[in-house]
Amino acid sequence: MSLIEFPLLDQTSSNSVISTTLNDLSNWSRLSSLWPLLYGTSCCFIEFASLIGSRFDFDRYGLVPRSSPRQADLILTAGTVTMKMAPSLVRLYEQMPEPKYVIAMGACTITGGMFSTDSYSTVRGVDKLIPVDVYLPGCPPKPEAVIDALTKLRKKIAREIIEDRTLCQSQKKNRSFTTRHKLYVRRSTHTGTYEQELLYQSPSTLDISSETFFKSKSSVSSYKLVN
């Protein structure tokens, strides 16, 4: 039996052959084809809108803004997220196909910003709702900072392994939040129902008995309240 002889590769054919792995090929194809879903609710989004102009030209990064979460693999949250908006944000994230990424842009998105101290309707950080890949602080961040965040995300994608991310996503459970911002395991939000188990109560009235509270209210006449 004669051995199989392979032809030798000359200089022309060797330059046209690429040896790589499936992970590197997948990561390379996703580096320059990020399709973001723009979730702008406040002034931080104005800074991102300036990237569309010719000065920064975010088209060179392959960014194609999409209006449907089913066609996007990146969601960029910019601005304040309230309790009423939270279920919609979680549903948009769940409708995005894998792999998907999140950039939290601005102080209001990351920590609640100036609303984090005495506002009962503001979410203190979007990472309590959806997992965040890149945090972009600022009030508001400059367009150069947004480009730097996109660059860091591209580097993170380049080092990613498909099996690890798939395993990590499969281990995650559905999450929900309360006004005290504690996470609990709940059923999927695809059902369209959202449970609000806790109502907000002012800390000043929590320790006051109902009898004392109504006595203090009855001591003020309606005439004084109106006038």
From Swiss-Prot:
Its membrane topology: Peripheral membrane protein
Keywords for this protein: 4Fe-4S, Chloroplast, Iron, Iron-sulfur, Membrane, Metal-binding, NAD, NADP, Plastid, Plastoquinone, Quinone, Thylakoid, Translocase, Transport
Protein name: NAD(P)H-quinone oxidoreductase subunit K, chloroplastic
GO terms for biological process, alphabetical: aerobic respiration; electron transport coupled proton transport; photosynthesis, light reaction
Entry GO CC: chloroplast thylakoid membrane; respiratory chain complex I
EC number per UniProt: 7.1.1.-
Any GO molecular function: iron ion binding
Protein function: NDH shuttles electrons from NAD(P)H:plastoquinone, via FMN and iron-sulfur (Fe-S) centers, to quinones in the photosynthetic chain and possibly in a chloroplast respiratory chain. The immediate electron acceptor for the enzyme in this species is believed to be plastoquinone. Couples the redox reaction to proton translocation, and thus conserves the redox energy in a proton gradient.
Domain of life: Eukaryota
Signal peptide boundaries: none
Binding site for [4Fe-4S] cluster: 43-44, 108, 139
Main location: plastid
Co-factor note (free text): Binds 1 [4Fe-4S] cluster.
Cofactor: [4Fe-4S] cluster
InterPro entries: NADH_UbQ_OxRdtase-like_20kDa, NADH_UQ_OxRdtase_20Kd_su
Family, as annotated: Belongs to the complex I 20 kDa subunit family.
NCBIfam families to which the protein is assigned, alphabetical: nuoB_fam, PRK06411.1
